[in-house]
Amino acid sequence: MHLVPLPALLDNYIWLLHDDDGNAIVVDPGDAGVVEHALAARQLRLRAILLTHHHHDHIGGAAELHGQHAAPVYAPDDERIEAATVRVHDGDTIELASPRVRFDVIAIPGHTLSHLAYVGAGLLLCGDTLFSLGCGRLFEGSPAQMLASLDRLSSLPGEILVCGGHEYTETNGRFAHTIEPENPELHQRLQEVSALRAQLRPTLPIALARELATNPFLRVDTDAVAAWCRQHGIDSDRVARFAAVRAAKDEFC
């Protein structure tokens, strides 16, 4: 399976997966034109569309693509996603014959209440829940819900590749540095990110193990993040620590 991040809109990624026989899947197609161009350039046939949540920058092109290609649209059970043809839920499995791939569906509420992730082919397609060096804003869910969702993702194999929905890594990295300025693995990641963005190259996908070593939202149980929280008057449970770091990020940018 080949993975291609398609830049779209302001800073979104539409994820394109395809096999050697020309069969393709797209994830969170906010812009149908970007997908059509990529399919034509690679001579691919669109076989399925996966949606993680209802925000327009992730679903805006789904209806048009379904109309053009008759590809099923897998989506959360959320009436705000009108383009859905197959509603999926936590614990479901999606099995496709062309391309031959299987995805496990995981509910990860927080950014939105009906947010889903798709796990398969060595990939974590996680929309706006987990970014490199960051996580999504809590538009609908609570800090406890978001932390529980991130815990679920953190338990996945370390080699799985995180495919978030936006190119936010530089800004996220600057914030992460304020939380853990002495983290050597974070320093290395920031150097890599700077070099990649200087060449206009994506900073995703990234192995989950590297996020576990550098992403402050996955590290609320570490001594370093706990120390930062104590410096800011938070000496409580892990949900409070997560909420404090998320609030600080909201004020950071």
Features from the language model and the residues they span:
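Active-site HxH/HxHxD metal-binding segment of metal-dependent hydrolases
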Residues: 9-10, 24, 31-106, 192
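Divalent metal-coordination and catalytic microenvironments
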Residues: 17, 28, 53, 65, ...
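Active-site metal-binding loops of divalent metal-dependent hydrolases
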Residues: 29-31, 54, 78-79, 111-112, ...
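Conserved beta-strand hairpin/beta-sheet module of binuclear metal-dependent hydrolase folds
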Residues: 1-44, 116-131
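Active-site-adjacent loop/tail segments of enzyme domains
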Residues: 134-160
